Design a protein with these regions (language model features):
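Cleavable N-terminal export/targeting peptides
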Residues: 1-37, 222-225
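Short glycine/proline- and aromatic-enriched beta-strand/turn motifs that initiate or cap beta-hairpins
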Residues: 29-76, 210-225
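Short loop/turn motifs that connect adjacent beta-strands in outer-membrane beta-barrel proteins
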Residues: 31-41, 76-85, 137-144, 181-186, ...
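Predominantly the C-terminal beta-signal and adjacent terminal strand-loop region
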Residues: 34-39, 176-225
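Residues that define the transmembrane beta-barrel architecture of outer-membrane proteins
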Residues: 39-41, 62-68, 121-128, 142, ...
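Transmembrane beta-barrel strands of outer-membrane/channel proteins
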Residues: 41-51, 86-94, 146-152, 189-195
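Extracellular loop and loop/strand-boundary signature of outer-membrane beta-barrel proteins
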Residues: 55-59, 113-119, 157-163, 199-205
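Gram-negative (and chloroplast) outer-membrane scaffold detector with strong preference
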Residues: 66-158, 218
């Protein structure tokens, strides 16, 4: 197996270990709790990994994907039992594992297919300036949430196939739980359906979907007036 593929698997194992540590940390101090109030801010980070690719929107498979995000959030609305947050995320590191392409003859056509044994890591970075999250049970320690984000990613090579593009749009939506183990500190565990596509800006646009499982940490504050 290629060394870069091994690095991705090690990254996934490390992410799982971090998630377990965060969960244990939350369990150790879960009695503190937190109430999300309008105007409060959060700063944090999360990392996620997708070992496989569904084909709900994109049609490309065999593309394990992972990313590390830095996140800022601000509570826009706070009601009795829920709160709405605006989010912006920076993606300093994104990595997708994809094989090289080779040309084969199928009938009267020359088509590109994945070349076996050529899996390699392609790195990228980006930003998601559009993001919303709704936290339920906003006065409780364990707060389920749903969220969605939209942004762009730029890779060092064409993704997810040759003839596509280094520049891709990225959208994602999902759910999770935010655990306030201290009044101003929390960990999050969640799932996000993630899709990247060049929106037909290149000759090929098969798109790629990911089942992104992630864990994160955030620190919250509210300026006093």
């Amino acid at each position: 197996m290629p060394k870069k593929m091994n690095k991705i698997r090690v990254l996934a194992l490390n992410a799982a270990a971090v998630a377990l540590c965060l969960l244990m940390l939350a369990a150790a101090g879960f009695a503190e709790g937190r109430s999300l109030d309008r105007g409060s801010s959060e700063l944090g980070f999360w990392g996620g990994y997708s070992p496989d690719n569904p084909t709900a929107i994109g049609i490309t498979t065999n593309r394990p994907f992972g990313e590390l995000n830095l996140q800022y959030a601000w509570v826009l609305v706070a009601r009795d039992n829920w709160a709405l947050k605006y989010m912006i995320e920076l993606v300093p590191v994104a990595v997708i594992s994809q094989p090289r392409q080779t040309n084969v003859v199928q009938g009267n056509f020359l088509v590109q297919v994945d070349a076996p044994g050529t899996q390699r890591a392609i790195y990228g970075a980006g930003i998601s300036p559009i993001g919303l999250q709704v936290n339920f049970r906003r006065h409780r320690t364990f707060q389920p949430y749903i969220n969605g984000t939209a942004g762009v990613l730029y890779f060092t090579d064409q993704v997810p196939v040759s003839g596509s593009s280094q520049f891709n749009f990225a959208v994602g939506w999902g759910a999770g739980v935010q655990i306030w183990y201290r009044e101003n500190q929390s960990v999050s565990l969640g799932y996000k359906f993630h899709h990247i596509s060049n929106a037909n800006s290149a000759s090929r646009n098969p798109g790629v979907d990911s089942n992104l499982f992630y864990a994160g940490y955030s620190w919250s504050w509210k300026l006093r007036r």
